[in-house]
């Protein structure tokens, strides 16, 4: 017998998830606290966080649960969702995700834990996958330049409207929208248009542009192809007429239909937009899915969002990179082409790989089968006396049934099928890749007719107009023909993943990005069909599990932030900003203060802030930043006084983008409120506040949060994300809503800012799980360890690099900025050199030159253990010694391992004529040959790629030596 017998009740307790999520254990924390000079986490954060903002109360959240318990709770919620066969359509369709893509992309941390490919040398796999996506979209749409994804079809259409206004001849003209466009797209366009004064006219364009509209100045035209009703029309006459009137034309096109139909580009369109959801991405109750935009080559430099291009590395080898970044929000701010930052990279990779796996012939076969099911179903209805409204359609059929529509939809539901109730007299249904013969029979039964599929298959002809059938080839590049077997596809995906650097490989200490653990338990439910297979416009009673999860997550986020109401609709942080600013705008206008349009933004703010403010119809006024990194209070006071009557809102990030807790934030908020303005607290840095302070309690009226930062949704290599907006009660009436789901927001809301009612609902179980697993105290400890880790790095590096800013007690918040400018001035070694050299040490670089040029901003998060933190610090200290060798002349300024970084495996062979050794190049201090990460390319020539813009898969001869 042992001296101590552990009670069964203790043996039954699983290790708390908090200990899985937080990297440093108790012993490591004690060492780190000693380095920083504090005795406990509470003592550290008491010194770091200003008293004026501290939250004394514990978070009122349910207690932490084990991983098994949380999965059981989620299973219970999932079981409350009823997944019927969806034939609603409207841009959301059943699809089969090839298991090789599901397992090796969607469920693979090598893909989903990567960051936006700002460091292209260690992002080559993802960039190639995105180039496949761009090539797929460009060739299917017939337009030469496609971006690397947008947020969804609705926002892509709104971006097209903005591009038309920016680049078209009639810049002040109206924007004309096809009445047969998707209703959610029309609503998103209206929401986006109103603040900037764009008039939106919706008209029936089936017979051309109405004369009364043609008499006016038209800036742009949006056509749906095929239409929401299913109609396939020859839109070329409308396109030609629009061009005669000086308007640009956008075609919202279904990519699967385009495998059979003439492309928008061939018909003369300037822009094509849409969604790639039906290319293997689950509906997920609305998202996430990759939207797309393709444009005529003359508009390439005005594209919103990311654009992947081809360049060369230092050895002249082909390499991929993000192209034309100077047009984006993080550089151009209020003059950017868009506020898009996070997009939908992971979903774009999936859609592109779906095309790679199936190839053009496979996509055509899926399209033909989908179309055949539609024609057979329609033929059976017609034979039974049901009037089919349109003679030409692809996958969607509208039937006229006077007074019977509701009854038919109800009967179909009884048969396990969701149809679309158009109005009292019309019902539509959409076929897709998953449609079966049983579903066809179920539709006939709901309409009260009978039919024989075999006989109708023999009799039913094609309904697509011969003049509109596609005749040109598409997806001709070898990548769309080489990976038909699962073995080949599996190895291709592995080969690409091996070229990338993600959290499964090592720490990604990007400041302001919060690259923390995305736990497997949190990720697992995303692929359950009860969450993945639900249509966003399914009846609410079929989504009770989802709606409960959404309500609970909204309430818990409100508790964490101190706000009264939260909307989960925004599907990116940029869209959360836009929604929050629209709420401020709506509030002022409701109070008769239409003149309040000035938005004060510190010069150090995230670039999306300014871009979002302009989209919300506001005038940006920049507030200076003081030398200590905080807002220049005197300049702020002067700007408030100057714009007192016009002041709408102040946008601040807290903690600041300089990584410090500003002590006078409450006073700043009071000054703005005294002038009649609102305070927008950007939630990008909320990982330093959870459990310690609440923006809604220290002066914030509105904030957006980043669930893909603070609440563990993975970054996906550049998306998906979720950017909920939280508001105080007086702004709640002006949150987003949705025309097709009344429960998605207030009747008085500003309209939808995302295509789906709850945005990227399919990934909300991740954040729900994180909060449930951690509980209130666990969330607080995660924050405290994040602050501890940042201060530990700052203390370790401070003897070697100046730490640029600090706050109370000489402490930083959850990130720190090290200043390389003195070293650059003395030695010529740039911040870029240090970032690339870190690759040789096996690290992704911190954030470069933001918010201060020539600096590195480091955010370790709470998830990295002490060994990894030390490995990073030791790499930085070793790099400092290398810089010293350059400064002393031991290595030439133009020939040293920093300037030559990163080094590939090619450095091990061939001639070597450098002033440093091969070993110094590839095995610097502390780097083991056994664990070495080898970058696939050397430093990429950024300027070459922009001068020689290539944004689709290069021909085979480009791969030759």
UniProtKB/Swiss-Prot annotation:
Keywords: Oxidoreductase, Pyridoxal phosphate. This is Glycine dehydrogenase (decarboxylating). GO terms for cellular component: cytosol; glycine cleavage complex. The modification N6-(pyridoxal phosphate)lysine is found at residue 709. The keyword Ribonucleoprotein does not apply. It catalyses: N(6)-[(R)-lipoyl]-L-lysyl-[glycine-cleavage complex H protein] + glycine + H(+) = N(6)-[(R)-S(8)-aminomethyldihydrolipoyl]-L-lysyl-[glycine-cleavage complex H protein] + CO2. PANTHER family: GLYCINE DEHYDROGENASE (DECARBOXYLATING), MITOCHONDRIAL, GLYCINE DEHYDROGENASE, DECARBOXYLATING. Gene3D superfamilies: Aspartate Aminotransferase, domain 1, Type I PLP-dependent aspartate aminotransferase-like (Major domain).
């Amino acid at each position: 017998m042992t001296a101590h017998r552990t009670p069964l009740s203790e043996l039954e307790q699983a290790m708390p998830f908090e200990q899985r999520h937080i990297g440093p254990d108790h012993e490591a924390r004690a060492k780190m606290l000693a380095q920083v000079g504090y005795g406990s986490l509470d003592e550290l954060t008491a010194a770091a966080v200003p008293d004026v903002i501290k939250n004394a109360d514990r978070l009122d959240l349910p207690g932490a649960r084990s991983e098994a318990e949380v999965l059981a709770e989620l299973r219970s919620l999932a079981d409350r969702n009823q997944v019927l066969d969806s034939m609603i359509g409207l841009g959301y369709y059943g699809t089969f995700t090839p298991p090789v893509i599901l397992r090796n992309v969607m469920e693979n941390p090598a893909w989903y834990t990567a960051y936006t490919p700002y460091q292209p040398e260690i992002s080559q796999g993802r960039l190639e996958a995105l180039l496949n996506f761009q090539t797929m979209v460009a060739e299917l749409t017939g337009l030469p330049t496609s971006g690397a994804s947008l947020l969804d079809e609705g926002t892509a259409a709104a971006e097209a409207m903005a591009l038309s206004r920016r680049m078209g001849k009639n810049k002040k003209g109206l924007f004309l929208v096809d009445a047969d466009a998707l209703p959610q797209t029309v609503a998103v366009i209206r929401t986006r248009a109103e603040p900037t004064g764009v008039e939106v006219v919706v008209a029936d364009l089936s017979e051309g542009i109405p004369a009364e509209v043609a008499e006016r100045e038209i800036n742009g035209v949006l056509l749906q192809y095929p239409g929401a009703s299913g109609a396939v029309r020859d839109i070329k006459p409308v396109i030609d007429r629009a061009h005669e009137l000086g308007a640009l034309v956008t075609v919202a096109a279904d990519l699967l239909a385009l495998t059979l139909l003439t492309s928008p580009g061939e018909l003369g369109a300037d822009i094509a937009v849409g969604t790639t959801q039906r290319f293997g991405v689950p509906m997920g109750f609305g998202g996430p899915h990759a939207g797309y935009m393709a444009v005529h080559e003359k508009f390439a430099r005005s594209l919103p969002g990311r654009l992947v291009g081809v360049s060369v590395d230092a050895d002249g080898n082909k390499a991929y990179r993000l192209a034309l970044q100077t047009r984006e929000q993080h550089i151009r701010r209020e003059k950017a082409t868009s506020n898009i930052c996070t997009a939908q990279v992971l979903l774009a990779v999936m859609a592109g790989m779906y095309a790679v796996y199936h190839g053009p012939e496979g996509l055509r076969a899926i399209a033909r089968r989908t179309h055949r099911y539609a024609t057979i179903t329609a033929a059976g209805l017609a034979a039974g006396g049901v009037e089919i409204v349109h003679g030409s359609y692809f996958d969607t059929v509208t039937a006229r049934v006077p007074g019977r529509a509701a009854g038919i939809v109800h009967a179909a539901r009884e048969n396990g099928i969701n149809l679309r109730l158009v109005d009292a007299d019309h019902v539509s249904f959409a076929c897709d890749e998953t449609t079966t013969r049983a579903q066809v029979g179920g539709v006939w039964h709901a309409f009260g007719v009978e039919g024989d599929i075999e006989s109708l298959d023999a009799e039913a002809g094609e309904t697509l107009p011969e003049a509109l059938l596609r005749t040109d080839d598409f997806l001709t590049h070898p990548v769309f023909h080489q990976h038909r077997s699962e073995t080949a596809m599996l190895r291709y995906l592995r080969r690409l993943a091996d070229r990338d650097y993600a959290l499964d490989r090592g720490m990604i200490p990007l400041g302001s990005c919060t690259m923390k653990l995305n736990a497997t338990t949190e990720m697992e439910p995303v692929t359950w069909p009860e969450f993945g297979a639900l249509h966003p416009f399914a009846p609410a009673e079929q989504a009770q599990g989802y709606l409960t999860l959404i309500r609970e997550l909204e309430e818990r986020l409100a508790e964490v932030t101190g706000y009264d109401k939260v909307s989960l609709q925004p599907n990116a942080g940029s869209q959360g900003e836009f929604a929050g600013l629209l709420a401020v705008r709506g509030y002022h206008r409701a109070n008769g203060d239409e003149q309040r349009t000035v938005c004060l933004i510190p010069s150090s703010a995230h670039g999306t802030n300014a871009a979002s403010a302009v989209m919300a119809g506001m005038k940006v006024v920049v507030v200076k930043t003081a030398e200590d990194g905080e807002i220049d209070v005197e300049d702020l006071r002067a700007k408030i006084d100057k714009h007192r009557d016009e002041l709408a809102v102040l946008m601040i990030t807290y903690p600041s983008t300089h990584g410090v807790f500003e002590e006078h934030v409450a006073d700043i908020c009071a000054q703005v409120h005294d002038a009649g303005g609102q305070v927008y607290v950007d939630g990008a840095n909320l990982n330093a506040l959870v459990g310690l302070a609440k923006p809604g309690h220290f002066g914030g009226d509105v904030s957006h949060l980043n669930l893909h930062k603070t609440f563990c949704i993975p970054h996906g290599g550049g998306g998906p994300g979720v950017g909920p907006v939280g508001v105080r009660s007086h702004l709640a009436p002006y949150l987003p809503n949705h025309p097709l789901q009344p429960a998605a927001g207030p009747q008085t809301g500003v309209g939808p800012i995302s295509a789906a009612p709850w945005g990227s609902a399919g990934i909300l179980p991740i954040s729900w799980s994180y909060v449930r697993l951690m509980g209130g105290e666990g969330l607080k400890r995660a924050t405290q360890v994040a602050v501890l880790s940042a201060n530990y790095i700052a203390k370790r590096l401070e003897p070697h690099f100046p730490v640029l800013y600090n706050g109370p007690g000489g402490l930083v918040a959850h990130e720190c900025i090290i200043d390389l400018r003195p070293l650059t001035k003395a030695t010529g070694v740039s911040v870029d050199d240090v970032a690339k050299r870190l690759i040789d040490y096996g690290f992704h670089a911190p954030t470069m030159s933001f918010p201060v040029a020539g600096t590195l901003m480091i955010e370790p998060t709470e998830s990295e253990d002490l060994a990894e933190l030390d490995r990073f610090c030791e790499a930085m200290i070793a790099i400092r010694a290398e810089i010293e060798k350059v400064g002393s002349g031991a290595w030439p300024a133009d020939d040293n391992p920093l300037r030559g970084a990163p080094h590939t495996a090619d450095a091990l062979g061939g001639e070597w004529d450098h002033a440093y050794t091969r070993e110094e190049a590839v095995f610097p201090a502390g780097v083991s040959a056994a664990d070495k990460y080898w970058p696939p390319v050397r430093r990429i020539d950024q300027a070459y790629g922009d001068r020689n813009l290539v944004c689709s898969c290069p021909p085979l001869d480009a791969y030759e030596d």
